[in-house]
Amino acid sequence: MSQVHALSDDQVGQELRKMTAFIKQEAEEKAREIQIKADEEFAIEKSKLVRQETDAIDSAYAKKFKQAQMSQQITRSTMANKTRLRVLGARQELLDEIFEAASAQLGQATHDLGRYKDILRDLILEGFYAMNEPELVIRARQADYDAVREAAGWASAQYKHKTDKDVKATIDAENPVPEGSAGGIIIVGGNGKIDIDNTFEARLTLLKDSALPAMRKALFGENPNRKFFD
């Protein structure tokens, strides 16, 4: 039968020191593991925060850059539109000045009576063809009545020669064209319901509408944005 010997105080002290050293070593190793893990987690979290901040900065910069681009585009578009409107306005002013100058010179055609009679003949004959009626009324300035009668006689003969139809034209003395008119005539048919305004002012307005595209092209060149032409 074995005997159990009691440990001496020295032996107990040694065992305690061994256990203490072991526990201390375990604690230090555990502490190192915890520190390493904490450092790793800190590094990961730090990297995540840096990445988030970087992304936020990049996003904010991209947003500001996009806003700056849009603002620049809007500014360019606004300036281009203002410039285009100024150019169009200047062009329209030039066209208006041209027609105003033409309007101011309309009355000069009546100064040469021979030339004016030729014009009246053409205007009256044109009205005869357009109306194609046997009886018509001509309105004119009182000062032009004699010239109009002569021109109407010539136009009636030409109309008869070309169409083999007679046309009787009388002057409406009760409704003359205002003396302030530059000249020309108004032919009335359809029992007073239809009229053709061949006064100089009306012809200039008609010319303005019909010749405007050609004048724009002649003065300002081809419009690259125009798809349809008159």
Swiss-Prot record:
Pfam families noted in UniProt: vATP-synt_E
Keyword Transport: yes
Main location: membrane
Disulfide bridge map: none
GO cellular component: fungal-type vacuole membrane; membrane raft; vacuolar proton-transporting V-type ATPase, V1 domain
Location in or out of the cell: Vacuole membrane
Signal peptide annotation: none
Keyword vocabulary terms for this entry: Hydrogen ion transport, Ion transport, Membrane, Transport, Vacuole
This protein's record includes keyword Transport: yes
Record family assignment: Belongs to the V-ATPase E subunit family.
Function: Subunit of the V1 complex of vacuolar(H+)-ATPase (V-ATPase), a multisubunit enzyme composed of a peripheral complex (V1) that hydrolyzes ATP and a membrane integral complex (V0) that translocates protons. V-ATPase is responsible for acidifying and maintaining the pH of intracellular compartments.
Quaternary organization: V-ATPase is a heteromultimeric enzyme composed of a peripheral catalytic V1 complex (components A to H) attached to an integral membrane V0 proton pore complex (components: a, c, c', c'', d, e, f and VOA1).
Name of protein: V-type proton ATPase subunit E
Organism: Neurospora crassa (strain ATCC 24698 / 74-OR23-1A / CBS 708.71 / DSM 1257 / FGSC 987)
